[in-house]
Amino acid sequence: MKMSVTFLLILMILPLFTGEWQSGSRLSALKKRLLEKRLLQKRFCTEIGKDCGTSWECCEDCCIHGTCSHESNCANFKLR
């Protein structure tokens, strides 16, 4: 039992020392997923003047009082 646990630990730790398991590749995969999500969101976003629940739903920058608004209106709204 101890041998199998030790063997599994070695298999998990060994790539860290050999450089096969690089955090950079994991980060680039995460960035790629976030970019795909952002592009998908832009493709299926809510137009200006339509109802919205959050700013993520809007094609532009923000959702003010349940309506998608243009970026310039968002800046004015945030200043108030």
UniProtKB/Swiss-Prot annotation:
Record keyword Signal present: yes
Molecular function per GO: toxin activity
Q: Where is the signal peptide, in residue numbers? A: 1-19
Proregion residues are: 20-41
Q: List the disulfide bonds.
A: 45-59, 52-63, 58-68, 62-74
| One CC-aspect GO term | extracellular region
Q: Could you tell me in which tissues this protein is expressed? A: Expressed by the venom duct.
Localization (cell): Secreted
Domain remark text: The cysteine framework is XI (C-C-CC-CC-C-C).
The molecule here is called: Conotoxin Cl11.2
Q: What is the lineage of its organism?
A: Eukaryota, Metazoa, Spiralia, Lophotrochozoa, Mollusca
